[in-house]
Amino acid sequence: MNQHPDATSYQDEVAAGPGGVMTDDVGVITGDLTVRTTLEDDGHSARVSVQYTGAEEWYTLTGSPAPVPDGGLAAYHRDLLGRVRRGQAAQAT
């Protein structure tokens, strides 16, 4: 994971757990995914996109944009990766 404390975007590859993640575009996707979390211009919400690792098309994770907690974007991204690993149609909120 990008470790810079002032980063406005993080991107990581992760294997989705059983039940995958829920997207607005195509419903549930599963398997090896790339997750991108980007701070919105308001500085208080994050847009989350996912793709099958190695693919070109990105999908919006349901619930995105999501509020960024007090811990900041890095903390939100770490928590989100954990939820994706657990699966269960994980969402951005």
Q: Where are the language model's segments positioned?
A:
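Mixed-charge, Lys/Arg-enriched low-complexity segments
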Residues: 7-8, 57-59, 65-93
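A short, structured beta-strand/loop element
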Residues: 42-59
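A structural signal for beta-rich interaction modules in eukaryotic proteins
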Residues: 26-46, 77, 83-85, 89
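Negatively charged, low-complexity tracts enriched in Asp/Glu with abundant Ser/Thr
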Residues: 1-37
